[in-house]
Amino acid sequence: QSVDQCFNNYHRLVDINLADEGRMLSGTPAILAEKLTKEYGHEVEAYSRVAYARQRPFDVYTNDEKKLPYTFECIEVDSFFNRLFTPTVVAGSWRVAAYTPNAVVITESTARKLFPYNQEAIGKRMVMTSKIWSSPKTTPDSGGISYTIQAVIKDIPANVSMNFMRTIEVLI
């Protein structure tokens, strides 16, 4: 299967990568998406910002409130991600995740590592133990940001443009 064909809208997706002096930037600024929509109007149906995948350490709290340290491959996404990339939700709600501050969505494989059943992941807490460099003004140096798992989605294949050949485990 070719890149991105796992998504329902693959034939209408456009991947924009930004570079500054030859260095790839890790995400797309909101202003660019707004500008593209304004300038190209009817040609842009929707947009979503996705930061490149990177590993992030978390403490995950289990059913009995045990704290377990894990490092997950994470991407930062906005609330429109599901409109373009059509992930299949197997537990919880994308809508709740999109409108809840500090919500995360985890993949089915990640849920299986942590809990006996996908549904048991919903409402559980994950605390990031390091800084998010794409949001330096809002992230404490030591991390400490608490997230709540609001949805579990089917695994995202490794052959997608947003994380080519890397296994995504958590969407922040």
Predicted feature locations:
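Aromatic-residue hotspot detector
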Residues: 1, 10, 43-44, 94-98, ...
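Membrane-proximal extracellular/periplasmic loop immediately following the first transmembrane helix
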Residues: 2-57, 68
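Short, flexible, glycine/charge-rich loop motifs used to bind or transfer phosphoryl groups or to couple energy/partner
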Residues: 3-6, 35-38, 91-95, 116-117, ...
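Generic alpha-helical secondary structure signal
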Residues: 9, 31, 76-80, 84
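Conserved beta-strand scaffold positions in the cores of enzyme catalytic domains, especially
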Residues: 13-15, 47, 74, 167-170
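Short acidic/polar micro-motifs at solvent-exposed secondary-structure junctions
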Residues: 18-25, 48-80, 90-104, 129-147
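Short charge-dense sequence patches
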Residues: 24-33, 60-65, 145, 152, ...
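Mid-to-C-terminal secondary-structure elements
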Residues: 78-91, 102-172
